[in-house]
Amino acid sequence: MTMTPQHPGMPDEQRSVEEHMALSSLFTTLEDLTAWSRKHSLWPFNFGLSCCYVEQVTVLTPVYDQARFGAEVIRASPRQADLLVVSGTVFHKMAAPLLRLYEQMRAPRWVIAMGACACSGGMYDIYSVVQGVDRFIPVDVYIPGCPPRPEAVLDALIMLQQQVGSERRPLGVTVGNTAGLGFDAPRRRDQRRDERMAQTLLDPPESL
């Protein structure tokens, strides 16, 4: 909240302490101030695995200028970052290193899944590809596309900033059981896997 002086034209010597504070101070809550500072100072850590990362790097160019949103400083270490951007195809061999990097990030932390492969496995419905990065880490914003355009990345960043600005997180966050948050829910593509695989079983020539 802010304090509005009742007599803006009054001489300084006639103003009360409250009047002086209203002219030079802004009052707010610690939670709002913390959320505002986090919103305008995201520290991203990019985890690029495939062609989507090319579009993600394009956002850093002067044409799109990601620096306008306070997220231009790419961190080289997850210990210095609070935003993890996963772009590209996540193979099962990469799941464990990616989870380790996520666990090294300081809380609070956020995750953006960029591209169809990071969101749901994309067209790689095979044994070696994780069908969505949210299988092992929570995702805050999904960016569909193969690959997404740079404008979509900026839209996702703005959407995440709105979410961060409205959160009321303390300075430290303890994540409890996530069983009820839908991370372990069965995927529709997994439920229909047998049905789709049956379509590849053709009738033998002698039956025609």
UniProtKB/Swiss-Prot annotation:
One of its GO terms (molecular function) is 4 iron, 4 sulfur cluster binding. Its EC number is 7.1.1.-. Binds 1 [4Fe-4S] cluster. It is a peripheral membrane protein. It is found in: Cell inner membrane. It comes from the Bacteria. Its cofactor is [4Fe-4S] cluster. It catalyses: a quinone + NADH + 5 H(+)(in) = a quinol + NAD(+) + 4 H(+)(out). Residues 182-208 are annotated as: Disordered. [4Fe-4S] cluster binds at residues 51-52, 117, 146. GO terms for biological process: aerobic respiration; electron transport coupled proton transport. Its main location: membrane. Residues 185-197 have a biased composition (Basic and acidic residues). PANTHER family: NADH DEHYDROGENASE, NADH DEHYDROGENASE [UBIQUINONE] IRON-SULFUR PROTEIN 7, MITOCHONDRIAL. Belongs to the complex I 20 kDa subunit family. HAMAP family: NDH1_NuoB. NDH-1 shuttles electrons from NADH, via FMN and iron-sulfur (Fe-S) centers, to quinones in the respiratory chain. The immediate electron acceptor for the enzyme in this species is believed to be ubiquinone. Couples the redox reaction to proton translocation (for every two electrons transferred, four hydrogen ions are translocated across the cytoplasmic membrane), and thus conserves the redox energy in a proton gradient. NCBIfam families: nuoB_fam, PRK06411.1. This is NADH-quinone oxidoreductase subunit B 2. The gene is nuoB2.
